[in-house]
Every structure is written in structure tokens, then in C-alpha cells.
Amino acid sequence: MEYNDIATPTRTKQLLDQYGFKFKKSLGQNFLVDTNVIRNIIEAAGIDKTSGVIEIGPGMGSLTEQLAKHAKQVLAFEIDQRLIPILGETLSPYDNVTVINEDILKADVASAIETYLHHCDEIFVVANLPYYITTPILMGLLEKNLNINSYVVMMQKEVGERLSAIPSTKAYGSLSIAVQYYTDVKRIMVVPKGVFMPPPNVDSLVVKLTTLERPRVDVEDENLFFKLTRGAFVQRRKTILNNYMSLIQDSKEHKSRIIEWLEASGVAPSRRGESLNLNDYAQLSNNMKKYPELVI
């Protein structure tokens, strides 16, 4: 397979000079200039000519053009207006790409899927995510329960490691729980910082998140479930009791009931949030309705 291409230092620099483009640090702009990394991302995504693909932050189109070669339709969200004319040039050979100049965090993604990808058999997200908003993007998409089969996304290595972290490890936290609630997580490859222009300060990690047919644990109130998981990690070194004392309204007068709720859920009050797994948090969430005086 022949990759022509934007994803080389020479071609990227030529485009930068041609358009007088200056990187905005506030937008976390680091353009990928390595075709081998892109090839691995495409292969991990497993897309074909029946697939619809959502890309977030296409930059100059280095990944986008390869997605266009493999997918039925590509829908790219780009927040930076200055990149729109560049993308108009670099993606001009492809009639199966739509670029929307919009912030993905504010976009109506469900409506966009219905408008642009309705004729595709399956929907995938494939993207080099901006470091500074990786978590809001991922959680925003996952929590919307969109009909997305899988996500192959590149992010800061440290953040990527959190996604697959297990209990009682340093990387484990509320993000690990939330992502594993919705998906199976697989690490694909570490990407060195030198394959970007400009290079970021840290290495990256490509991960594949395959959406589960149903969430990993049965939860009656997802909003409460996520409040409890986030609340358990506000201060990692504190016990689950102390963190929830800070989370629950009028907790001092309800302390005995909080302890009772924890113990009835099979969670010792002296444990730390990092030691609990998804089933533990599901049990806490589902049992809380039996204690109506405990309000978050």
C-alpha cells in the first residue's frame, strides 16, 4: 500500500511555510510526521470500505488522508479555523471526507453521525487526541452512548496507561473505572515524541477501546455511580470513609449510616478508593438508594 504524503517532516514544513501557520500551544497542536505510526493506527482500527470514521483534531490531514483511503466516509472535527483552508488543499483528492470547524466538546456528535455517517455499517473513532482535553473528549463520547464500535486513539502515555490500570496501582483511578465500564482496553503501541512536529514533552500511547454490548457492571443510576467513583479519588491517600464524608451532605450527623452503607456493600470503611474494583463501586451505587438520607 502506498502512502504519499502529508505525514513527513518535509511536506509538513512546506505546508507550514506556505500558509504561514504558527502552532498554538493552547490547542495542544503536535502534528504526526511518521507514516509507519499512521499505518499501525489504521491497521489497529480495522476499518474498511463499509466503515464510517470520526477523527478529532485532523491538523493538516496526515491521518485523515489515510483514513479516507480505507474508509467509506470520514467525518473530522477541527476547532482551529486556520487549518480549514490547509485541509481543503490536502484533502482535495478525497470526496469521502467532511471537515467540520467545531469544538468536539460542544458538537452534536449524534446528529453529525446521523447526517454524515448514516450509510456506514459501523462507526469508529480514530484520532490523535489533543493532550489537554483527552479525558473530556473520551468521556463525553462514551457517556453519550453513541453507536461507536471502537476507538483507536493516541494520547499522552501517562493518560493512556490509566485507561487499562488495575486496582491498587498508582495509575488506577476514576478514569480507569469509567473507561473500563464502557469498553475493553488494549494498548497498541508507544509512540516516541520525536515523530511529531513540534515534539511534545512526553511520549504517547495508542490504545484501542472496544465498546462493550452492555456496560461491564449493572448500575441502576450511572450518574450516582460516576459521582461515587470520582469522589473516592479526590484525595487518594484518604480512606473511602473520609472521602465520602466530604462528598455526602451533612455527613457528620449521618456518619453511622455512611459506615453502615459501606459495610452493607462489602466495603470496609478503612479501605482506600484505589483498592476497589468496578463491582465494588456498582454495589455501593446500587445500595445507596436504601439510605435516602445520604445525599450527594
Swiss-Prot record:
Family that this chain belongs to: Belongs to the class I-like SAM-binding methyltransferase superfamily. rRNA adenine N(6)-methyltransferase family. RsmA subfamily.
Gene Ontology terms: cellular component: cytosol
Signal peptide (residue range): none
Subcellular location: Cytoplasm
Main location: cytoplasm
Residues reported to bind S-adenosyl-L-methionine: N30, L32, G57, E78, D103, N128
Species per Swiss-Prot/TrEMBL record: Macrococcus caseolyticus (strain JCSC5402) (Macrococcoides caseolyticum)
EC number per UniProt: 2.1.1.182
Pfam families: RrnaAD
Reaction it catalyzes: adenosine(1518)/adenosine(1519) in 16S rRNA + 4 S-adenosyl-L-methionine = N(6)-dimethyladenosine(1518)/N(6)-dimethyladenosine(1519) in 16S rRNA + 4 S-adenosyl-L-homocysteine + 4 H(+)
Organism lineage string: Bacteria, Bacillati, Bacillota, Bacilli, Bacillales
Protein's recorded name: Ribosomal RNA small subunit methyltransferase A
InterPro entries, sorted: KsgA/Erm, rRNA_Ade_diMease-like_C, rRNA_Ade_Mease_Trfase_CS, rRNA_Ade_methylase_Trfase_N, rRNA_adenine_dimethylase, SAM-dependent_MTases_sf
